[in-house]
Amino acid sequence: MKVILTMAISANGMIATKDGSEDFLSHDNWERFVNLANRIGCFIWGRKTYDAVSKWEGDFLDDVKGLKKVVISHSPAKLVEGFISANSPEDALKKLEANGFNQAIITGGAAINSEFAKRDLIDEVIFDVNPSILGEGIPVFSPTDFLTNLELVSSEKIAGDIVELRYKVTR
């Protein structure tokens, strides 16, 4: 299965402020995620990302209503309708494959991103780099021992001053 990591980040690689706020990110990032997710048909989140998005004001989860959505959690979480639970990256991918998917998006948080990278499960990386720098924050990857080499596929200025960087993982 092809696994695509896609994240909206600050210029210095943060996905959220120290307290979890994503207010520095443009709404264009969400729209781009929704468009990609609709093309692929599914995505994987960690429990903390699921919890954070569930608390956003508005009906953001309606944007992904028809998609297969997996939340990875070591402690079973109460999920809203349309989400399924998995206990590991491999379990999440197995559940999506069983539903006929051959591609999946992962989009955080840091711990889940690191677990996929550590297991060498990521095939492509898309970073939407926002024009902000955070002194403190939550990085794309939590501190874990792994090395993933990348080859730049494309770079493009998209909405506003956001730059999309696309990489393929080299093995």
What do the PLM-derived regions correspond to, one by one?
Residues 1-171:
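Enzymes that bind and transform nitrogen-containing heteroaromatic metabolites
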